[in-house]
Amino acid sequence: MSKIVKVIGREIIDSRGNPTVEAEVHLEGGFVGMAAAPSGASTGSREALELRDGDKSRFLGKGVLKALEAVNGPIAQALLGKDAKDQATVDQIMIDLDGTENKSKFGANAILAVSLANAKAAAAAKGMPLYAHIAELNGTPGVYSMPLPMMNIINGGEHADNNVDIQEFMIQPVGAKTLKEAVRMGAEVFHNLAKVLKSKGYNTAVGDEGGFAPNLKSNAEALEVIAEAVAAAGYKLGTDVTLAMDCAASEFYDAEKKEYNLKGEGRVFTSNGFSDFLEELTAKFPIVSIEDGLDESDWEGFAYQTQKLGKKIQIVGDDLFVTNTKILKRGIDNGIANSILIKFNQIGSLTETLAAIKMAKDAGYTAVISHRSGETEDATIADLAVGTAAGQIKTGSMSRSDRVAKYNQLIRIEEALGAKAPFRGLKEVKNQA
């Protein structure tokens, strides 16, 4: 009943109007799984390769016909007759067939779309929700939790056309008792932030991830207007709502000069100086998590940052670790950061993603499940967060259906699981239990 009989790939459109790969996996019993690959804007240099056509006459070179050739040709042929329930074998067949270190032959976008579609088809064949199937693949059947959201309500950096250098300013509704309540609190702060920005004469257009993208005077002002919005919504900053940031510091790092350049406010920092700047912000605001607070190659700087802040807050590696167990192991062995951001298109298969989550948890690191800035209506990351009991999810703001689709899926899952999937709030964040 779970043998693969057909694999289909197609080109669909993501939330930025660019093509991406969608795959369908059909099984013997008439079961079908469908999934789409997301796409990043600020990408780590060690990520698995997203294969684009480069033909400027189609989609400005961003077409994915080459990746589709792989899905509809060699991948489809190699998977015929294989058991979809054996996810590790399905993924390994594609990885071996590609034969490159970074999946550059077929593209991580091709392999991932098929990998996720296969998991969905297998879940359907087993007659269980995707999150339950993922928990079984993870070796933790029946173990679930609802993740604490990190909601990106002010967008800067590569996610917005403004003068704010730090890429994401996020809220975490830690005072909520349930995921559904956390979503409501986030929505209320989001709407109050719109009022605060308008009252100051700022633009309320949104960025790629659904957060506002105003031209603020400084990065600290982003935290100040969020603090105002939290109060206006009737919540207490630090108790009901905490703050988180994704610096995406590789985007404003000058490798030649070894400097971090916040152009928006005309300030330049050394590596340790930027970590000291972040420490100052954590003293002024209840920031409990900082992601990519330095360039992905600045391991020495990350050692200093972890030593400085790693006992107080969550230090998340995104571009630093790129969901790659080899790189994560180096971080763990050297005491670099204490958390990993999980983006399955950085590594390119569900099996490898689950391995990264397990390695992180075994080492006492937290794992934050994440979307990409280029998304679709595919909500697989919601099931991944619940099925691995990861504890935290980052899936954008309270606008744009490509973001909200994930929150809505989480609401449905929480309703289905009830007390079997506890919402632990701030306890999920490293150093905040």
From Swiss-Prot:
A motif (Plasminogen-binding motif) lies at residues 252-260. It holds the Pfam family Enolase_C. Keywords: Cell inner membrane, Cell membrane, Cell outer membrane, Cytoplasm, Glycolysis, Lyase, Magnesium, Membrane, Metal-binding, Secreted, Virulence. PROSITE patterns: ENOLASE. It catalyses: (2R)-2-phosphoglycerate = phosphoenolpyruvate + H2O. Its EC number is 4.2.1.11. GO terms for biological process: glycolytic process. GO terms for molecular function: magnesium ion binding; phosphopyruvate hydratase activity. Binds a second Mg(2+) ion via substrate during catalysis. The active site is at E209 (proton donor), K343 (proton acceptor). Disruption phenotype: Probably essential, it cannot be deleted unless another copy is present in the bacterial cell. Changing K427N: 60% plasminogen binding in vitro, 10% reverse activity (PEP to 2-PG). Pathogens have evolved a strategy to activate host plasminogen and manipulate plasmin activity for their benefit; plasminogen binding (even without its activation to plasmin) increases their adherence to host cells. Plasmin activity leads to degradation of host extracellular matrix proteins like collagen, fibronectin and laminin, facilitating bacterial dissemination and disease spread. Vaccinating mice with recombinant enolase provides substantial protection against subsequent A.hydrophila infection, suggesting it could be used as a vaccine. A 'plasminogen-binding motif peptide' partially inhibits binding of plasminogen to enolase in vitro; mutating 2 of the residues restores plasminogen-enolase binding. Catalyzes the reversible conversion of 2-phosphoglycerate (2-PG) into phosphoenolpyruvate (PEP). It is essential for the degradation of carbohydrates via glycolysis. Belongs to the enolase family. Component of the RNA degradosome, a multiprotein complex involved in RNA processing and mRNA degradation. PANTHER family: ENOLASE (PTHR11902:SF1). This is Enolase. It comes from Aeromonas hydrophila. The lineage of its organism: Bacteria, Pseudomonadati, Pseudomonadota, Gammaproteobacteria, Aeromonadales.
